[in-house]
A protein has these predicted regions:
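Hydrophobic alpha-helical segments
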Residues: 1-492
Length: 492
C-alpha cells in the first residue's frame, strides 16, 4: 500500500513513523478536524442504495464473498442477500436460538467466517441462559445449527477467526477474554487473558469502568477495549496462553479512583474505549469512544474515534482524531445520541457509525489529517450501529437500531455506496425541533436533569452502559415488545 505525497512514493509504514519524527503538533481541534470533500469538489449527492426493515436489528457483519450480510436481531438473527446492494433481500430469519433447551435472548452480536456463523448472548446479565451457538451457513438461506456452549456469564460481544472464537467474559469479579475452539462437533474452551491478573489495582474500580466491551483480532493480535482502563493489545498466537503486548489509555487508575460517582466515570469522557480495530496492514489502529455529556468536568461531549500508529505494536503513537457530530442535548437520556459506535478500517478508509449522527467515510491515509469523504444521516428515523464493507469494495452495509431511549425508531439494514459525496438537505442535529418526535425536552449544554443516567440495578449488580431497566425481559416476546416501546435502551 503506497501514498503519493508531492511526487514521492512512500510505504505507509514508513510514512506513519516519518510523520512522527517530523514533529507533529499536539492534537487539537484545528490540527485533527476532518477535511470535508464536498459536492463542489466534483462529487455527487450521497444517499443509501437500499434498506431492509429488521425488527431488533443490532450488529451486522458481511460474509466473505460479499453477497450476504448477517444481522443480530435481539431475539435471533437474520441473513440478507446483498448481492445487489440496491435491493437487499431477506434470506432467512431465525428467532428460536436455544442453549441447552432454553431460549437465547438479547442477541446483539454475531460473527461470521467462511461457512461458520456464531450467535452470542445475552448482551447483559439477567436475561436467562447465556452462551454461544454455531451455525453452518454454507447456504445462507438455510442456516443449520451445529453446536452450542453454555457459559456462566453474559456475552456482550465476540469475534470469529477461523476455528477460534474470542469472547468477552465480564463478571463482577473479572473482565476476561476467553478463547474457544469451534471447529469441531463440540465447542471447547482453550484459554483466557485477564486484565485483573495483570493489573489487580483495577479491581478497586467499578466493574463497568474496566469492562471489556468488545474484541477484534488480526494477525494473531487481539485488540481489547477495556473502557477506562484503555485498549490492550494481546498476543494470541498461542490461544492457550495469551500474552500482553502493550496498551493505550486516556486516563489513569489514580484518576479513576478519584471519581466519586460511577456514572460520571462510566458514561463520560475521558476513557470509554468501546471498540478497537486495525486496518488491513495492521499499522493503523482506531479506538472508538462511546460517551455522553454527564454535566461533569470537561470533556463533556460525545465520544469520537482516535487514530494510533501501531507499526511498532510495542510503542503505539497517537496520530489523529475524528470528532463526533454535535447536537443540542448530548446527554444519555436526551436520546439524541451522536457518539461513536462501531466501525471498520479497510483500504485507507474508515467507515464509521454515530447512532443518530449517521454514517461517515473518512480517508485516513494521513491519520494526522483525516479527510471526510461522505456523511449521511436521518436522525428522525435511524440510529446506526455498525458499518461493514462488502467484498466487492463498492458498497457497505450499516445496521440501524430502534432501541435508543425516548425515541420511535425502526430497526433496519441499509446499504451505501463507497464514494465521495454530500447529502442533499440533511436534517439538522443542532436544531432538531422540526423532526424530533421525542417527548423529553432538550437543553443547550446537555447538562441538568436529562444527564441522569440509568439506575444501576439489575438483580445481579452487573449492568452495562446503555442498558437500563431490562433485567426482567427474558423472553423473546417481551424483549421485542420492549424494543417496540423503546422504553429502554439496547447499546452495544
Amino acid at each position: 500500500m503506497y501514498l503519493h505525497l508531492t511526487g514521492v512514493t512512500m510505504d505507509r509504514r514508513a510514512f506513519l513513523r516519518a510523520s512522527g519524527a517530523a514533529g507533529l503538533a499536539p492534537l487539537s481541534i484545528s490540527s485533527t478536524a476532518p477535511r470535508v470533500v464536498t459536492a463542489a469538489s466534483g462529487q455527487g449527492t450521497y444517499e443509501p442504495l437500499g434498506s431492509l426493515p429488521i425488527t431488533g436489528a443490532a450488529e451486522a457483519v458481511a460474509g466473505d464473498h460479499g453477497e450476504t450480510a448477517y444481522v443480530a436481531a435481539t431475539t435471533g438473527f437474520v441473513t440478507v442477500d446483498v448481492s445487489d446492494p440496491a435491493e437487499p433481500t431477506l434470506l432467512a430469519e431465525e428467532r428460536n436460538v436455544e442453549i441447552g433447551g432454553s431460549p437465547l435472548t438479547q442477541i446483539l452480536d454475531v460473527s461470521v467466517d467462511g461457512d461458520r456463523l456464531v450467535v452470542a448472548g445475552p448482551a447483559n446479565p439477567g436475561f436467562g441462559v447465556a452462551g454461544v451457538r454455531r451455525y453452518d451457513v454454507s447456504d445462507p438461506a438455510d442456516p443449520v445449527s451445529i453446536a452450542g456452549f453454555e457459559t456462566d456469564y453474559h456475552i456482550h460481544n465476540c469475534v470469529l477467526e477461523g476455528e477460534l472464537l474470542y469472547v468477552v467474559a465480564n463478571t463482577q469479579q473479572e473482565n476476561r477474554l476467553v478463547i474457544f475452539d469451534v471447529g469441531g462437533d463440540e465447542i471447547a474452551q482453550l484459554g483466557y487473558w485477564s486484565l485483573l491478573e495483570r493489573e489487580p489495582g483495577w479491581g478497586d474500580i467499578d466493574m463497568l469502568a474496566r469492562y471489556l466491551h468488545d474484541v477484534s483480532v488480526r494477525d494473531e493480535t487481539a485488540y481489547l477495549p477495556h473502557w477506562n482502563a484503555g485498549t490492550y493489545l494481546v498476543d494470541v498466537s498461542d490461544p492457550t496462553d495469551p500474552a500482553y503486548v502493550t496498551h493505550v489509555a486516556e486516563t489513569t487508575l489514580e484518576e479513576q479512583r478519584a471519581i466519586a460517582d460511577w456514572r460520571t466515570a462510566v458514561y463520560g469522557l475521558p476513557g470509554n474505549d468501546h471498540y478497537a480495530a486495525v486496518d488491513d496492514t495492521g499499522d493503523l489502529m482506531a479506538v472508538g469512544r462511546e460517551a455522553w455529556a454527564t454535566g461533569g468536568s470537561a470533556p463533556a461531549r460525545p465520544g469520537g474515534i482516535d487514530l494510533y500508529d501501531v507499526t511498532d505494536p510495542t510503542d503505539p503513537v497517537k496520530r489523529g482524531r475524528i470528532d463526533p457530530p454535535r447536537t443540542i442535548d448530548e446527554s444519555y437520556r436526551g436520546g439524541l445520541w451522536t457518539t461513536s459506535h462501531n466501525f471498520e478500517l479497510r483500504g485507507e478508509r474508515l467507515y464509521s457509525t454515530w447512532y443518530r449522527g449517521g454514517v461517515k467515510i473518512h480517508d485516513v491515509s494521513d491519520p494526522a489529517n483525516p479527510e471526510r469523504l461522505a456523511w449521511w444521516r436521518d436522525p428522525a428515523r435511524t440510529a446506526f450501529w455498525t458499518a461493514r464493507v462488502l467484498a466487492s469494495g463498492e458498497a457497505f452495509v450499516a445496521s440501524s437500531t430502534e432501541a435508543i431511549p425516548n425515541t420511535s425508531l425502526e430497526g433496519a439494514l441499509y446499504t451505501f455506496p463507497i464514494e465521495a459525496g454530500t447529502q442533499a438537505d440533511p436534517l439538522s442535529l443542532r436544531n432538531p425541533e422540526d423532526w424530533r418526535g421525542d417527548t423529553n425536552g432538550t437543553n443547550e449544554t446537555g447538562e441538568g436533569a436529562h444527564n441522569e443516567t440509568a439506575t444501576r440495578s439489575d438483580g445481579s449488580g452487573d449492568s452495562i452502559p446503555g442498558f437500563t431497566g431490562v433485567a426482567g425481559l427474558a423472553s423473546g416476546a417481551v424483549a421485542l415488545g420492549w424494543l417496540r416501546r423503546c422504553r429502554g435502551n439496547v447499546q452495544d
